[in-house]
Amino acid sequence: MTMERIKIFTRSFDLRLYLNSKGLFDKLGVPVVRLTDQSADGYFHTMLKDTECDIAVNIDEDAFLTDPDAMFRLIDYVVENGYANAGCPDGGGFCPRAANPIVTNPFFNILNLKLIRTRYDRKAIRDFNYKEHKEEMIKHFPNERLETKYDFDRTEQEPYYPFFLWLAYNFRTLYLPSQRHEDGMTTILKDLEGHTLCLHTWFARFYTTPTWLVRFVDSKRGIQKKRIDAVIDQAYSIRGMERPSFGLTDRLSFIVNKIIRWIIKVPQRISRWPYKLRKKLRHRFHPDQTD
């Protein structure tokens, strides 16, 4: 495998958090791409359009790489064994969710873009009827990954569900084991040999939101920054690296960047309201129909 055919992609909203995550992989000799202002499903199509990349490492800005060597070994394993995707089940493992385990949560994925492109079709993804194939797909799911609550009937948990359901039906997915961090929230993602690949903290959207505002919106999420910072420190300690420090100019750029991101994000959110409303009405009055 040639290194230049691998790229690391991150869908990012918070520049400060992104730079903390990027600091753990930006010197690996692999091109790094920050994707901003893209939808939760659209950025996978952006990766697939990048014909200079055969293997995409998709990592969230609140996921922190702890073992690059394990990551590269996993890439080799994925390619050599004909997998299209490797990642953490969205249910049944130690994500703070109980959703559909056939879908891999995109906080960390190895995506074999070269293989996926052999059948890639956006219309086929939209038209894929999971309910018709559900029982068959469940039979092929590794039961050893079902350690906690899950729900194979969930099909609309997130916008990226259609992509990953289609992917799991048409190609092989490697489902990785996970553990719960001692903080009670962070997911520790493992490879098949038990090495820790990354630490995913969740709730990145609350990282730089004032605590008083977070508590007003969601009283249970007011301590996220302190918890996430502790995990970032842990990841850098594991790697034997010094965490990035930011000066006044950096902090100003973070503020400007966030303002720009919100200016773009709000209209995007509003534009999807009619679609979400139609979707809710359709499933209320026609629950047997698929999207």
Regions found by a protein language model. Give the residues of each.
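C-terminal catalytic/acceptor-binding lobe
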Residues: I138-D291
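Short, high-confidence coil segments that cap the C-terminus of an alpha-helix
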Residues: C53, N81-A84, F171-R172
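Short beta-strand-to-loop acidic/aromatic patch adjacent to the donor-nucleotide binding site
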Residues: C53-F64
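N-terminal anchoring/stem segment of glycosyltransferases
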Residues: M1-D54
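A structural signal for short, well-ordered beta-strand segments and their strand-loop junctions
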Residues: R34, N58, N85-P89, I110, ...
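Short beta-alpha junction loops
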Residues: D14, P89-G93, Q179-E182
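Conserved catalytic core of nucleotide-sugar-dependent glycosyltransferases
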Residues: F64, P68-Y161
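Long, low-complexity, intrinsically disordered polar/charged segments
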Residues: T2-Y18, K27, L74-I75, L115-T118, ...
